[in-house]
């Protein structure tokens, strides 16, 4: 399995979310709403999730091994860093569609 495309939108938010990504796997399958989060130990990737009635977040889609998780995280963060903080980037308000 290879990440064959990454689309990234930076977001303006008071929280720790910095961007939302969509990835394509093997030119055949797309996963939307992957978040780039600025955590206590640096940036990390959070898979799409849904809040349960008891307030807990559950992943909707996620890799089942650390190697695949690493490939996804590397691809998304490489694109995030490649884009940099250029003023030419369009920022999107968090929650706006």
Curated annotation (Swiss-Prot):
Protein name, per record: Putative septation protein SpoVG
SUPFAM superfamilies listed in its UniProt record: SpoVG-like (SSF160537)
InterPro entries: SpoVG, SpoVG_sf
Pfam families named in the record: SpoVG
Keyword Cell cycle found: yes
Keywords, sorted A to Z: Cell cycle, Cell division, Septation, Sporulation
Family: Belongs to the SpoVG family.
A biological process from GO: division septum assembly
Species this protein is from: Bacillus velezensis (strain DSM 23117 / BGSC 10A6 / LMG 26770 / FZB42) (Bacillus amyloliquefaciens subsp. plantarum)
Function: Essential for sporulation. Interferes with or is a negative regulator of the pathway leading to asymmetric septation.
């Amino acid at each position: 399995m290879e990440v064959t495309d990454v689309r990234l939108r930076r977001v303006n938010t008071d929280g720790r979310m910095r961007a939302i990504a969509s990835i394509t796997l093997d030119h055949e399958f797309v996963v939307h709403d992957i978040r780039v989060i600025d955590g206590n130990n640096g940036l990390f990737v959070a898979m799409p999730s849904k809040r349960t009635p008891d307030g807990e977040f559950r992943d909707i889609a996620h890799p089942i091994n650390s190697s695949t998780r690493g490939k996804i995280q590397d691809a998304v963060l490489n694109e995030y860093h490649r884009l940099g903080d250029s003023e030419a980037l369009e920022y999107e308000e968090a929650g706006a569609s």
